[in-house]
Amino acid sequence: SDINEHIPTLIRYGQECEHITEMGVRGIYSTWAFLAAAPKKLISYDLEDPSNWGGNINDVYETAESYGLNFEFIKANVLEIEIEETDFLFLDTWHVYEQVRDELKLHSHKVKKYIGFHDIVSWGERGETEGYKGINYAIDEFLENNNEWQIKEKFLNNNGLLIIERIK
């Protein structure tokens, strides 16, 4: 998958969290990583059903249930919802400046520990849609304007992964 090399990192951060919010599910690869971290609650959002990408969300529900974990998949536009307070927010939706800027503006105040961003290399400078700026502009702008957040870890392999942490 386009994220497989980051699975151990996602599990590691997930293990420090009781509540994880994932935005952008696609084929549920990162969802499995977060479930493996065994948080008390995992909520995953996407505009489309994971079956469109070959993922079976029912498998996730069954696995979560068998381990006593609270999992919920919500089909929604993440710019039109209000999330629960969460320890880790993972963003992997539409990889353009405006989308990530708005996701951060809407949801970052609900995040207690970490925000993760996938595809900082593949869609960092140039957005995934022609004519749009990449996500790194939104991340840099957010960090510049919110000094309670700082970069924790950055990986350039497998499309790139960035973890920022709340420091106050």
Question: Which residues does each PLM region occupy?
Answer:
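S-adenosylmethionine/decaboxylated-SAM
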Residues: 2-168
